Design a protein with these regions (language model features):
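Small/polar-residue-rich segments within soluble enzyme cores
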Residues: 1-67
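Residues that form generic nucleotide/phosphate-binding pockets
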Residues: 13-14, 33-41, 85, 212-216, ...
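Carboxylate/His-rich catalytic cores and anion/metal-binding grooves
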Residues: 18-48, 89-92, 96-119, 240
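Beta-lactam-recognizing serine transpeptidase/beta-lactamase-like catalytic domain environment
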Residues: 48-65, 74, 99-147, 153-301
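Helix-start/capping segments and mature chain N-termini
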Residues: 70, 74-78, 87-91, 136
Length: 301
């Protein structure tokens, strides 16, 4: 506002651009991102005074112009419905105890053909007070462990690096490395070992298919109770993350909002971190990144 003036931490930068201390500027969201577009341009005038200090004439050196308008791709009615849906769902989960320790709930809807953002919705849950607050910006600033949704990208990495061929069949089985606890899929104890294709691995959400694919990126083939050499660990993680990045995971999405997070992709990691990353349990991504990932699949890349 004019009363508040320029934000103190950014005042110097704005003054260098010709702003005045009492100018009104955008401080968040799209208003901040498009400040120069929305602000317009002031007229520059030259005032001539007589020897007594009285104004004699005014010459316009530069004509001013109004700021431009921007049109959002977000559909207000749809945005409101998504907001209401999240609120209803999260309150229901709180009531039955399912969201007691949840930090909140977020949703993004994109047009996969154009990339247009149709809705960005979020609810932040304060774990200390239980308070719920709207947090749409959290869809681009907050990061989360994605879980099984990344499995399609893991299989893509297998194809891209020659580890998998087409709808390749592997054995879905309990994975046991020397000196480590078993890694299972959610159904392993009930069904034991059986052959599974790449498509079925996605359909059933197989963890062990992803582990074997990740092991293949290291140049190794799974054998029960095997010793895993880690000389190729770094290059294998680079391959996996490179494919993830092609889907927009761990990279800037290019959305026109300030302060976008590119995710949390630790530089230091162990073999266990790498293996679990193959089924979405290490690197962290924003809801917007995950939406872009799914949109990439939806529009056939």
């Amino acid at each position: 506002s004019e009363k508040a003036g320029l934000p103190a931490e950014e005042a110097e930068a704005y003054l260098k651009k010709g702003y005045s201390l009492n100018d009104r500027v955008g401080t968040s969201y799209l208003e901040k991102q498009y400040e120069e577009t929305l602000q317009g341009k002031r007229s520059v005038k030259e005032i001539h005074l007589d020897k007594y200090g009285n104004m004699e004439s005014v010459d316009t050196i530069e004509e001013g112009s109004k700021g431009n308008n921007i049109k959002l791709t977000i559909d207000l009615a749809f945005q409101d419905s998504v907001d209401a849906l999240l609120k209803s769902y999260f309150n229901s989960e709180l009531e039955n105890g399912g969201a007691k320790y949840s930090e909140g709930v977020y949703a993004v809807a994109l047009n996969p053909k154009t990339g247009a953002v149709l809705s960005m919705s979020g609810i932040k849950h304060d774990l200390k007070t239980g308070e719920l607050t709207p947090d749409s910006l959290g869809t681009v600033t907050n990061v989360f462990v994605p879980g099984s949704v990344v499995k399609a990208a893991t299989i893509s990495s297998g194809w891209e690096n020659g580890v998998l061929s087409g709808n390749q069949t592997l054995t879905d089985q309990s994975i046991v490395f020397q000196g480590s606890a078993p890694i299972n899929s959610w159904y392993t104890q009930a069904y034991g070992s059986f052959p599974i294709t790449a498509v079925q691995a996605l359909e059933y959400s197989s963890n062990t298919y992803m582990v074997q694919t990740a092991l293949g990126l290291m140049g190794q083939t799974y054998q029960p109770n095997m010793f895993v050499g880690t000389s190729n660990l770094e290059s294998a993680m680079e391959k996996l993350r490179s494919t993830f990045g092609e889907y927009g995971l761990g990279t800037a999405t290019g959305i026109d909002l300030p302060d976008e997070s590119t995710g949390f992709v630790p530089k230091e990691y162990s073999f266990a971190n790498y293996i679990t990353n193959a089924f979405g349990q290490f690197d962290n991504y924003t809801p917007m990144q995950l939406a872009q990932y799914v949109a990439t699949i939806a529009n056939d890349g």
